[in-house]
Amino acid sequence: MKLEDAKIKYIHTWGSLATSWGINKTMAQVHALLLVSTVALSADEIMETLKISRGNVNMNVRALIDWGIVRKEFVAGERKEFFVADKDIWELFKQVTKERKKREIEPVLKVLDELQKDVNENEEGVEEFKKLMSDLSSVTNTVNGILDRAIKADEHWLLSNFTKMIKK
C-alpha cells in the first residue's frame, strides 16, 4: 500500500472509530489528517483533502484547539492560518485524558455530591438513594484518581502498572 493510501485509510478509520468514543467523526478525521501531515496545513488544504466545508473545518479546528491537541503555526510569508497537531502520542493521551476528566468526570462528581446533600430526608427510599449516590461517587472518585495519576505519570510507569494489573 502506498503511503498516501495508508494515510487516507488511517484518517477514515480513525474517524469511524471515534464515534464509538463519543467524538465527532469529522473532528477525528481533521485531527488524524493533522497528525499524519508532515507540514502545517491551512483550512483550505484540510477542506480539499477531507472534502468538507470551510465552516466544518473552522468549527472542528477550533474545538481541537480548545482540547489542546492542535495549535496554530505561523508560516512566514503567508496570511492564512496554519494548523498542526502534536506528534507525541503519550502527550496526546494525557491531554485528552485531562480534558475528558474536566468535561465528563468532574461534572458527574459535582452532581453526585449535590444529590447526596440536597435530597429531601423525609421521603421513603432516601437512604437507599443516598447510598447509591455515595457508591457511584466512590467509584467515580477512584476513576478520577487513576486518571490524575495517568496524567502526571510518564509513559513507562503507566504501561508497567497497567501490564501488572492485567497479569493478575
Predicted regions and their residues:
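A short acidic, leucine-rich amphipathic alpha-helix
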Residues: 45-48, 64
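Short, Lys/Arg-enriched N-terminal segment that forms or immediately precedes the first helix
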Residues: 8-20
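Glycine-centered, phosphate/nucleic-acid-interacting loop/turn motifs that mediate DNA/RNA or nucleotide
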Residues: 68
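Short, cationic-aromatic polyanion-contact patches
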Residues: 18-26, 42, 75-96
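Amphipathic alpha-helical dimerization/coiled-coil segments
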Residues: 89-135
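C-terminal regulatory/oligomerization modules of transcriptional regulators
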Residues: 117-168
